[in-house]
Amino acid sequence: MWGTAMDISADQAGNWAAKWEQSFNMNHDQVMEIADVINYLGNNYATTAAEIAESVNEAASMGQITGVDPKATAAIAASMQAMGVSADVTGTTVKRIYTNINKGSMATAKQQQAFARLGMTAEGVAKAMQVDGTGTMLNIFEAIGKLPGEQKLSTLNALFGQWAIEGGAKVTQNLDLLK
């Protein structure tokens, strides 16, 4: 049924549902809630439910480890895609952001400097992600957005990595779309 709503085949919908039940450790009803959120986002953002679902399939289980609910991963993916980040890049971008801001004591010196620029610490962010991953990410994007223009790109690069700059920059500059 949600295959029709997302304009994907029943086989693809069933495939994703089965994978999500396993990888997200959820039951069928919980997976259907995610599908409903994805369908809503696809209907209300400049992207499609199928593109969002593809990114969720790629990044949401990593998001769960870092403290971000799969529905929030869907919202992050939809926001990036609505701002022009291609669907095939979004999943990788989201995974890189999750990985890089959760290094804690293993963060590089440049990452630690970037967090300090934001008034944060790598260890503090990693711990905060486990309590409220989505809220912590919003705080990071908001803090980057408040930096002087000449510091934004280098901070995005240090925190998220070169391959996630585009998505991170677009979310930072259009944070209301994510909220």
Regions picked out by a protein language model, each given a short descriptive name:
Residues 1-44, 51-58, 69-179:
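Alpha-helical architecture feature
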Residues 45-46, 63-66:
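Short coil/turn linkers that connect adjacent helices within long alpha-helical scaffolds
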